[in-house]
Amino acid sequence: MDDNTATLTAIHQQQQSHNRFSNPLVCVGQLDHHSLLPEHSISSSLAPLTHNPYAFNYSIPLPPTDITTKLPKLELLSLDVKQEQDDNHLDTSSPTDSTGNGSTNGGKIQKPRRQRTHFTSHQLTELENWFSRNRYPDMACREEIAVWISLTEPRVRVWFKNRRAKWRKRERNYVIDNGQGTTKVTAQSLDPLGSLQNTFPQTLLQSSSSQLDDSAVTSSSFYGYGGAWQQNPYYSRNNQTTFNWQIKPQDQFQFQTIPMSPTTATSRFSTAANLAPLPTAQAAFSTSATSSNDKLKLMDGLSNSLSSSLGQPYQPCQYSGPL
């Protein structure tokens, strides 16, 4: 019983000392040797607790939290927020910047827009003249142009840059247009015969083709090369004469020769001469008509000799005159 009373007395003294000093760390530093309990009394008071730990339920109270220690930090945060709000209010309240040219949009200062340069007719004329002579002027040339037309060198440099871009665009379009025109001309040149036929009338082409056919048949029958392939014998328009020559008794072949009269030959060549009325062509045609007359005379002599030698075996002829 005495031991329990001593233990309670020691605990009561500890509570009193704890209530006197709110901070236990400070109270330990401020306690003097008189206020400390003797070691033998503490050991004697804690001895029963080791034997019976459930003798009483005691919990050491925690030190109270000091709210005042957090107040300065909160005050600083509130001051920072208030300063930011004041800055934003100042930014939004000023519609123009320091230069007085730009405006703010959502707190961001926009770059002032550069005004366009309006050139006069005199300036444009001088610039075009310089551009026709030199498309890439150097610094000294640009400065000279700027002084001459009362402009700044950067404005002249920008004008030449834009003018070169415009010139390149026009050149590109011009090359494309010329390429399309070249393809059209090439497509037309792929058919030269059709273009020639279109240049001449159809009646002239038909008459020339018929004359060529007539001359081919006439030459074959003129030199005695008639055959079975010739279905219809050729008959001249004037003075038709047919000869039946029997060369061999055992084999009889019928050759039809049509000697051409001078009038017929002259009429043929006169038709061709009318198609191309040139002095040199007429002289050539008259010469050919004379040679054709000589050939006709030779053929008449040959026909007379052949008609006199009918019924005799065939002998080759010897030609001595000019053909």
Swiss-Prot record:
GO terms for molecular function: DNA-binding transcription factor activity, RNA polymerase II-specific; RNA polymerase II cis-regulatory region sequence-specific DNA binding; sequence-specific DNA binding. Pfam families: Homeodomain. Residues 112-171 bind DNA. It comes from the Eukaryota. GO terms for cellular component: nucleus. InterPro entries: HD, Homeobox_CS, Homeobox_Pitx/unc30, Homeodomain-like_sf. Residues 91-102 have a biased composition (Low complexity). It is found in: Nucleus. Gene3D superfamilies: Homeodomain-like (1.10.10.60). Residues 83-119 are annotated as: Disordered. CDD domains: homeodomain (cd00086). Keywords: Developmental protein, DNA-binding, Homeobox, Nucleus, Transcription, Transcription regulation. Transcriptional regulator within D-type neurons that controls terminal differentiation. Required for the development and function of the 19 inhibitory GABAergic (gamma-aminobutyric-acid-secreting) D-type motor neurons, which control locomotion. Plays a role in regulating synapse formation in dorsal D (DD) and ventral D (VD) GABAergic motor neurons, possibly in part by regulating the expression of the neural regulator oig-1. Also required for expression of flp-13 in DD motor neurons. This is Homeobox protein unc-30. The gene is unc-30.
